[in-house]
Amino acid sequence: MPTDERLAVDLLARTEYGRVAASLRAMPFLACARHIVADGRLLLRMHRGHGYHRACVGHVVAYGSDNLNRARPGCAEGRWSVEIVGKCAAVEPTAAELELFGPAPRSVDGGAPFDPVYLRVTPQFVTVDRQGAT
């Protein structure tokens, strides 16, 4: 695994949520997703009811996460952001992966039941941006 990929995996493990970017009917969109990294694979959990997963599966997507709103000035890790670009596929997570995700939200958008869908992003490009790390 290349150095940037290892660093990206380490940094992503420090956060729980990020944003997936894809195209829906030729229009770009961003959607929030819960993520885990298991065996070097990026797995996402999204709400099926929004339908965003249909635009992701079988296509190249970008997924990003960061600590920009949590990093304090002078902290040793500094500010960082990670972006992974790769092919997306629908998956059924293992019991161990489901445990890593933790409990799903009960509802979304003011009361609709959360219906999870799971996606895997196979990295083709990884970008790590670090600022102020010591």
Which sequence ranges carry the predicted segments?
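A short mixed-secondary-structure module that forms the rim of ligand-binding clefts
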Residues: I36-A71
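Short connector loops at helix/strand junctions that flank enzyme active sites
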Residues: T15, L30, V37-D39, C56-V60, ...
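Beta-strand residues in well-ordered beta-sheet regions across diverse protein folds
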Residues: A21-S23, R45, G64, T122, ...
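Charged, amphipathic alpha-helical segments
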Residues: T3-E5, M46, G102
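Short beta-strand segments
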Residues: T15-H47
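Short, basic/aromatic recognition patches
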Residues: M1-R19
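Charged, gly/pro-rich active-site loop segments
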Residues: D66-T134
